[in-house]
């Protein structure tokens, strides 16, 4: 058996240890890739699916025409809609509820809506203390729509070429 000088040199000089230490030092002095979350927030995609919202037209009228397509397409059966006819013959929603504990954020409701009434907005920070707060009624959904309308409209415009 012959003496392997190269292998012995690597072993005695702890070459693997030196390579590992160098790699660790390189990552130690490099900029950190993580964000300090509550204080720093990363960019969101225009296609991000967050908290649900009902939108209104610019004149203030509700967009929802009570076609119930979103209710029919929801795989989790999280949406409940009741409607009544208006004087002019069109329909109006009297009840629009979403059970956020059932919702799987698939976006089918948004895709099925012919008038872009129900959308999933940019808000992802809506933790609650009780389960009942995750049952969204029509007023809560309309308030979300009013709060996030500018960003929702911008995101829908950016996403329009892909729809």
From Swiss-Prot:
Sequence positions that bind [4Fe-4S] cluster 2: 74, 103, 106, 109
A Pfam family it matches: Fer4_7
Catalyzed chemical reaction(s): a quinone + NADH + 5 H(+)(in) = a quinol + NAD(+) + 4 H(+)(out)
The protein's Enzyme Commission number: 7.1.1.-
Membrane topology: Peripheral membrane protein
GO molecular function: 4 iron, 4 sulfur cluster binding; iron ion binding; NADH:ubiquinone reductase (non-electrogenic) activity; quinone binding
Reported cofactor(s): [4Fe-4S] cluster
Keywords of the record: 4Fe-4S, Cell inner membrane, Cell membrane, Iron, Iron-sulfur, Membrane, Metal-binding, NAD, Quinone, Repeat, Translocase, Ubiquinone
Cofactor note: Binds 2 [4Fe-4S] clusters per subunit.
One GO term of the biological process aspect: aerobic respiration
Binding site for [4Fe-4S] cluster 1: 64, 67, 70, 113
GO-annotated cellular components: plasma membrane
Highest taxon in the source lineage: Bacteria
Protein's cellular compartments: Cell inner membrane
Annotated 4Fe-4S ferredoxin-type domain residues: 54-84, 94-123
Function: NDH-1 shuttles electrons from NADH, via FMN and iron-sulfur (Fe-S) centers, to quinones in the respiratory chain. The immediate electron acceptor for the enzyme in this species is believed to be ubiquinone. Couples the redox reaction to proton translocation (for every two electrons transferred, four hydrogen ions are translocated across the cytoplasmic membrane), and thus conserves the redox energy in a proton gradient.
Record text on subunit structure and interactions: NDH-1 is composed of at least 14 different subunits, Nqo1 to Nqo14. The complex has a L-shaped structure, with the hydrophobic arm (subunits Nqo7, Nqo8, Nqo10 to Nqo14) embedded in the inner membrane and the hydrophilic peripheral arm (subunits Nqo1 to Nqo6, Nqo9) protruding into the bacterial cytoplasm. The hydrophilic domain contains all the redox centers. NADH-quinone oxidoreductase forms a supercomplex with ubiquinol-cytochrome c reductase complex (complex III or cytochrome b-c1 complex) and cytochrome c oxidase (complex IV), which stabilizes the NADH-quinone oxidoreductase complex.
Family, per entry: Belongs to the complex I 23 kDa subunit family.
Protein name: NADH-quinone oxidoreductase subunit I
Lineage of the organism: Bacteria, Pseudomonadati, Pseudomonadota, Alphaproteobacteria, Rhodobacterales
Gene: nuoI
